[in-house]
Amino acid sequence: MSDIQLNSLKPAEGAKHAKRRVGRGIGSGLGKTAGRGHKGQKSRSGGFHKVGFEGGQMPLQRRLPKRGFTPLGQHLYAEVRLSDLQRLDVEEIDVQALKAAGVVGQGVRYAKVIKSGELSRKVVLRGITATAGARAAVEAAGGSLA
């Protein structure tokens, strides 16, 4: 391999395309109308409408009804899998421990354990609810919910 110098670096063959020069005469293939066709709104400078504009017809986003809402308390709750509890190296688990381990976000106030994955070690859940299946799995592993 030859010495590579900063002043000898060049892009690979075919990697760069020549800039499209429009409105520079008939011979260029992009003269006169410069690829814009003849007349009409789109041929003129500043001649573009906003996205969703339908020529004065009521646009689709206004014809369709509004639906649903965003619950404000959505980010307060988090679901935790049994496999997440298995990975934690503490026996007593509460929301603070889940936050510290990065299992749930910092804005979470309430957590619920769902039956997803395996749990083979004893854990004590404090201030955390669980589904019926998850509760059975925790108790089968020798743990409890406080």
From Swiss-Prot:
Pfam families: Ribosomal_L27A (PF00828). Residues 1-65 are annotated as: Disordered. The keyword Transmembrane does not apply. Keywords: Ribonucleoprotein, Ribosomal protein, RNA-binding, rRNA-binding. It comes from the Bacteria. One of its GO terms (molecular function) is structural constituent of ribosome. GO terms for biological process: translation. InterPro entries: Ribosomal_uL15 (IPR030878), Ribosomal_uL15/eL18 (IPR021131), Ribosomal_uL15/eL18_sf (IPR036227), Ribosomal_uL15_bac-type (IPR005749). Residues 24-34 have a biased composition (Gly residues). Part of the 50S ribosomal subunit. Belongs to the universal ribosomal protein uL15 family. Binds to the 23S rRNA. PANTHER family: 50S RIBOSOMAL PROTEIN L15, LARGE RIBOSOMAL SUBUNIT PROTEIN UL15M. This is Large ribosomal subunit protein uL15. It comes from Bordetella avium (strain 197N). The lineage of its organism: Bacteria, Pseudomonadati, Pseudomonadota, Betaproteobacteria, Burkholderiales.
